[in-house]
């Protein structure tokens, strides 16, 4: 079982608000009329000055990236930043996010979203992926997807608690993984969805310093899973919620008749609650449980932590 150290990402956001003021004067005759016309035009037309200098342009870009432009058919923005963790060392991550509405006549349903992300570090770690939620007209159904590939040079102590607590078992190896998770859910009641899901996982351990720690298990595993997912979602915004609740219960099966070398099942529960405290501040609570049973391959055993779990939300 891998020991997971806290992954800390430092992202610096710089914000600036720009405002402009117009002076309205009152005179007599033609000058007064011209100023009244200018005042009327100032009330109806806003001229935004282009930022000058590289720093101001970067600040303006970050400010605009946080705004939802509902008049655009596809609102896409890119953001990136440096990070550091004890496992992967220094790196740079980039995310391109898009918001769109499949039907122009549907102005009530939440916006669909898609994100393309990439990360690379000095320790030869990399991760590439795409994920998102496509919301069908009137929110009658949703398609959720997450596809990614990653490689990391990390450490291994063995399978199970007793082996992992022995520091003498520490060994290095390279871990490559490819994961695909897709679900299609129908809305059965307000904010309640249910539907099938499928997963495909490929895991490959390479350059193992102590292969005996795997206790004869395959260094390469390929698993296909199918199951059912139930979701409750009344968040105000899917990708950056400030209020509401999201609950998801997944039950997956990886049987042998799907060509799996390891047959096992998985139950996963995810709860998240968001409550606004004051402007731009939100308290968020998260509960995550992942249980596997059966002949679970070493690479799909549950771990503590991970980059997908919340540590702070402000």
Model-inferred region functions:
Residues 1-55, 62:
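Cleavable N-terminal export/targeting peptides
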Residues 47-56, 60-69, 74-83:
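Interface/linker segment at the passenger-translocator junction
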Residues 63-69, 99-105, 131-138, 182-190, ...:
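Outer-membrane beta-barrel proteins
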Residues 68-77, 83-219:
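Gram-negative/organellar outer-membrane beta-barrel architecture
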Residues 76-78, 112-116, 141-147, 194-196, ...:
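Transmembrane beta-strands of outer-membrane beta-barrel proteins
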Residues 118-127, 155-162, 183-190, 223, ...:
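Noncatalytic linker/hinge segments flanking ATPase motor cores
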Residues 207-234, 311-313:
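Outer-membrane beta-barrel transmembrane domain signature of Gram-negative proteins
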Residues 227, 231, 235-314:
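C-terminal outer-membrane beta-barrel translocator/porin domains of Gram-negative envelope proteins
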């Amino acid at each position: 079982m891998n020991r997971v150290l806290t992954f800390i990402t430092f992202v610096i956001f710089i914000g600036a608000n720009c405002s402009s003021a117009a002076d309205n004067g009152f005179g007599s005759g033609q000058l007064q009329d011209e100023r009244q016309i200018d005042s009327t035009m100032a009330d109806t037309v806003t001229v935004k000055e282009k930022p000058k200098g590289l720093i101001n342009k970067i600040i303006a870009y970050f400010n605009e990236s946080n705004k939802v432009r509902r008049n655009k058919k596809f609102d896409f923005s890119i953001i990136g930043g440096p990070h550091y963790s004890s496992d992967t060392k220094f790196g740079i991550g980039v995310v391109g996010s898009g918001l769109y509405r499949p039907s122009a006549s549907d102005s009530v349903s939440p916006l669909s979203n898609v994100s393309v992300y990439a990360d690379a570090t000095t320790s030869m770690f990399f991760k590439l992926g795409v994920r998102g939620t496509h919301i069908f007209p009137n929110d009658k159904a949703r398609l959720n997807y997450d596809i990614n590939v990653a490689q990391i040079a990390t450490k291994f102590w063995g399978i199970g608690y007793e082996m992992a607590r022995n520091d003498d078992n520490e060994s290095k190896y390279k871990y490559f993984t490819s994961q695909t998770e897709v679900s299609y859910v129908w809305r059965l009641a307000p904010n309640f969805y249910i539907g099938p899901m499928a997963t495909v996982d490929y895991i490959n351990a390479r350059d193992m310093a102590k292969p005996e720690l795997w206790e004869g298990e395959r260094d390469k595993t390929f698993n296909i899973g199918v199951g059912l997912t139930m979701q409750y979602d009344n968040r105000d915004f899917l990708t950056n919620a400030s209020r509401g609740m999201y609950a998801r219960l997944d039950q997956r099966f990886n049987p042998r008749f799907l060509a799996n070398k390891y047959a096992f099942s998985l139950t996963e529960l995810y709860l998240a609650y968001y409550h606004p405290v004051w402007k731009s501040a939100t308290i968020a609570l998260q509960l995550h449980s992942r249980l596997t049973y059966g002949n679970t391959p070493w690479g799909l055993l549950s771990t503590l932590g991970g980059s997908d779990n919340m540590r702070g939300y402000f």
